[in-house]
Amino acid sequence: MGAILGKKIGMTRLYNDKREAVPCTVIQAGPCYVTQVKSTEKDGYEAYQLGFGERDEKKVSKPLAGHYKKAGKNPGYILSEVSKSLIVGELEAGATVPVDVFKEGDKVNVLGVTKGKGFAGVVKRHNFGGGSRTHGQSDRLRAPGSVGGSSDPSRTFKGTRMAGRMGGKNKTVQNLVIVKVMPESNLIVVKGAVPGPKNSYVKIVSTTK
């Protein structure tokens, strides 16, 4: 069991024993540090708050800088909570969580924010087929079509798929296999893709399935 925060470096490929190319994602995972320990008595649940990265103290608010100072750490780029059950042993504020909490062959879930695509139409956003390319039409190639009848129901139903902001949402990719762990450089290599662009922050947790 384990949990750690990290930064997506990018994708590459590794070759397995059968000389097959395996697409992989390289993640700079940790070292993370515990900034706060949540307890049932005080907070109603048990968790560790982890921090990752290092940030100029001038660029964070004073309350947040004080929060990090209480743990004896410099301000980081990201804070996130993980359940105590995911980390073996008891940790105190200021303790380090290294990358070798995971080992090769472990299955993990990776949580991140997907790439933002901006305002997108229904063909790109919802995979609509668009209108006919012939029979006299001139401007309906990528149109959504009817979104509601005139007399009945005289309205557009809630949840109707339309154009709008695409991407930039929280996403969890489950059951990715860890192909390689490199403690000396704090890198984890997982099989497959993870959410988000390069240099985006992700959370890696052991799968419970």
Swiss-Prot record:
InterPro entries: Ribosomal_uL3, Ribosomal_uL3_bac/org-type, Ribosomal_uL3_CS, Transl_B-barrel_sf. GO terms for biological process: translation. GO terms for cellular component: cytosolic large ribosomal subunit. Keywords: Ribonucleoprotein, Ribosomal protein, RNA-binding, rRNA-binding. One of its GO terms (molecular function) is rRNA binding. Gene3D superfamilies: 3.30.160.810, Translation factors (2.40.30.10). Coiled coil: none annotated. HAMAP family: Ribosomal_uL3_B (MF_01325_B). One of the primary rRNA binding proteins, it binds directly near the 3'-end of the 23S rRNA, where it nucleates assembly of the 50S subunit. Part of the 50S ribosomal subunit. Forms a cluster with proteins L14 and L19. Belongs to the universal ribosomal protein uL3 family. This is Large ribosomal subunit protein uL3. It comes from Chlorobaculum tepidum (strain ATCC 49652 / DSM 12025 / NBRC 103806 / TLS) (Chlorobium tepidum). The gene is rplC.
